[in-house]
Amino acid sequence: RERGLLREIAAWLAAFPQASAAIDDDCALLEARRERRLVTVDSLIFGRHFDESVSAFDAGRKLVARNLSDIAANGGVPSDAVIALVMSGDVAQGWLKEFYRGMLETCERYNLKLVGGDVASVAGTHFFSASMTISGFAGTHVLRRTGANVGDFICVSGTLGGSIRRKHFAFEPQLALGQLLAEKNLASACMDLTDGLAKDLPALVPAGTHSALDFSAIPLSEDAGGNVKAAFVDGEDYELLWTMAPEKFEQLRALCGNMKITKIGEIVAGTAGAGTDFGGGFEHF
């Protein structure tokens, strides 16, 4: 089945200009540039990240988009991707074709080249796992999770909460905003929101400080139903969360056009924060 499947995959790839994989070669050949590279990897596993209610197209789209969100969090420009599939023999070829279509259309949308991959089989049934590694280019300023200072504003893009009602399969990675924050050196620290504010925000807060949040300012999605707890624990918002010097906020607002940005708090000296009883956000294990 392997050779036949590889022939089918080669045919699917041929329909998309962003897929430049030489499927018979052992390695992808990439042009070298002098810029610094960003590399990220993420996985999508049936039964963990999606189930039968999710279309193959949406699953393929999400695999690419969640990796691109990592590139956005560092302010990078995506370049190349490779994919590794592990699946049981009962995964239908038609389903796999739609998965590839979701991946490839998303690659095309964000000018990402799929340059290689691997396929392996496992015993049993109903098993599917896809891991994608994306590389990109970083400019002079790279957004990192460390660097926030006392007095910095805490900001988010878009709206938060309620992702379980499909947003986590239809989100747009915030590449343009991440690139703007990096290019103009506007953010002191940045990350993408994948596990909810309760778990992700502490990663940006330096030791000896805490976050003072304005709960009324947190931008909630319609699917959150007005419940601010959703922004803290739902996870998979795939928005950007960053800190910045107060004097740079209006500069960013003037530059970001239609992109929605919101100040939700500040970094404050001392460790006696107000806290929440919202729990710890999404846990992977």
Model feature map: region roles:
Residues 38-41, 126-127, 141-180:
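Short, acidic (Asp/Glu-rich) active-site segment that either coordinates a divalent metal cofactor
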Residues 75-84, 115-117:
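Short beta-strand segments at enzyme active-site cores
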Residues 17-18, 27-28, 104, 118-123, ...:
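A generic local secondary-structure boundary/capping motif
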